[in-house]
UniProtKB/Swiss-Prot annotation:
Quaternary structure (record): Forms a cylinder of 14 subunits composed of two heptameric rings stacked back-to-back. Interacts with the co-chaperonin GroES.
EC number: 5.6.1.7
Highest taxon above the source species: Bacteria
Name the record gives this protein: Chaperonin GroEL
Compositionally biased tracts (Gly residues): 533-547
Matching InterPro entries: Chaperonin_Cpn60_CS, Cpn60/GroEL, Cpn60/GroEL/TCP-1, GroEL-like_apical_dom_sf, GROEL-like_equatorial_sf, TCP-1-like_intermed_sf
GO annotations of cellular component type: cytoplasm
Organism, as annotated: Cereibacter sphaeroides (strain ATCC 17029 / ATH 2.4.9)
Molecular function terms, GO-annotated: ATP binding; ATP-dependent protein folding chaperone; isomerase activity; unfolded protein binding
Amino acid sequence: MAAKDVKFDTDARDRMLRGVNILADAVKVTLGPKGRNVVIDKSFGAPRITKDGVSVAKEIELSDKFENMGAQMVKEVASRTNDEAGDGTTTATVLAQAIIKEGLKAVAAGMNPMDLKRGIDLATSKVVEAIKAAARPVNDSHEVAQVGTISANGEAQIGRFIAEAMQKVGNEGVITVEENKGLETEVEVVEGMQFDRGYLSPYFVTNADKMTAELDDVYILLHEKKLSSLQPMVPLLEAVIQSQKPLLIIAEDVEGEALATLVVNKLRGGLKIAAVKAPGFGDRRKAMLQDIAILTGGQVISEDLGMKLENVTIDMLGRAKKISINKDNTTIVDGNGDKAEIDARVAQIRNQIEETSSDYDREKLQERVAKLAGGVAVIRVGGMTEVEVKERKDRVDDALNATRAAVQEGIVVGGGVALIQGGKALDGLTGENPDQNAGITIVRRALEAPLRQIAQNAGVDGSVVAGKVRESNEKSFGFNAQTEEYGDMFKFGVIDPAKVVRTALEDAASVASLLITTEAMIADKPEPKSPAGGPGMGGMGGMDGMM
């Protein structure tokens, strides 16, 4: 086991604070509408330019192990806030730095760290209650656009795109962000259910220009296993031909003789047909087939339930108004499913979302809800260069997360004002002893840090701005850093999601409390450098006489 280096007391805390400051100072320059960019070197390709706090934090690794521990703890604040709220990472970092700085000063002055922590926790819970109480619901897409604009560092176009996407697919719909190959940023909405499986043979194509298979008023056969032979299906196929309607087969696979027979039938014009593989794998495939069955009013033909292909009748098939299939995707529009059954299925999946602990599973379940309930919108981010596209995509991701948070828990005054207004809930609050009171005072001071930093990044004196805002009795009075004027922040359209502000404060206070109560730090001792190799041995002289 490697030897350890142990630091105690003031020495440990000073080293840790240096690390905290290095990371926080790099992150906080991005805060606010006039926040600056950070350029990050990459081991390959062009450097990355970003204004996203968590992206900056993730890149920082310090050579001094003790300083690095402090930096990693604050990185944890940014990561947790990003995971919970999807935005507000820079605010959380600024708050954490402010609480840690003031807290360590108090510890150095001889106060009890545990009482300071209790005071900080007490004050934080009071302010969080005040933020929740001040939140009001998002009323229209104009407010959604404003939240998106603020989170995208003041780019109104990004806010508008997100509002448009949310309007089209609803609050439950899935909105994904992709890089566009062109210069323009655009929103594309996929109505109905889309899954990532294309046609099994290009011979199924009906529109040769677009290379798509388009089927109208179509029957859908959902089969859980592979189809190798069509012999058991002959009665069903004859019934479909009689109905003169097209048929889509969705199965684990359609192979060999079965696929060849379908293609020959299609080419001869006897049967309008197409076949695609079922989406997903394993249990997820079964669940998605069941989703499609409920959406189209059909049944999944499953051997687990004792169903055989030869016994399938035409009324066991699903129906849809239109199906469009290209080489990569299948889209089912206007399925024939019963609305009550679809709603029940959505409620069932939502319960699974509540219960799951896996982020990946949660994301996949949310996609399934969206496909059943709303639809899917894709925001394609364009730009002149790859670096610009990546930087804008970061901001669109942030803005999208912020608007989702706003829809969930409502909005509060933006620009750091909500924290200062929340701080007024601490007036008259006292702890059980003077050290706890000091903890409450630390939080009260720290709440001004984001507003001060926003003003500072805009080239204005942060102390003056914070003083003016603090003295005002109007709850929505603040400083608009974009236009450098004071007034009603709601009228300026400077608003933040309550969830983002609340999460930033909770996570910052939680990690800061841990750092303040640290008394010892342990890290691996640096390996001693091995001595450089000695000079090469000379030739062995003086042995001429030896034969």
